[in-house]
């Protein structure tokens, strides 16, 4: 966007950038919280604005990974599901049995090894490796939920794509370049 339009969101010398962060309620299929920010601030700062609900699931992409914020979600009695970054170092504590015909390749209890992740989130986490049988895409999930099945966690993450479709719709109708 040009600076004449979004002067409040500078990004480069002659260009502005706006980030739209949303919280999407899966049950009602309504965006329950929307936050605009300039393009200079990191995406994870959005999590500080969210009022957390007990037993709610917060499903997010890798840009929102912050173990300090995950701890806040966990302490609120809520759950998160995200994709595991490839550079994350963890230690496997236990492997749950899986049926690989469902697409679940592994379901593990892990603990983070790196200093800051283990400092901010010392509790156990769950790592789920999933292969989408339709698209052959391989995904690794990280969650603090140990109650749902691994397949249910993978299905929850698929709901995140509804937000991506919303952003695609906005870009098409407002003629915004990314």
Give the role of each language-model region.
Residues 3, 7, 11-178:
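Single, function-defining residue in the core of a domain
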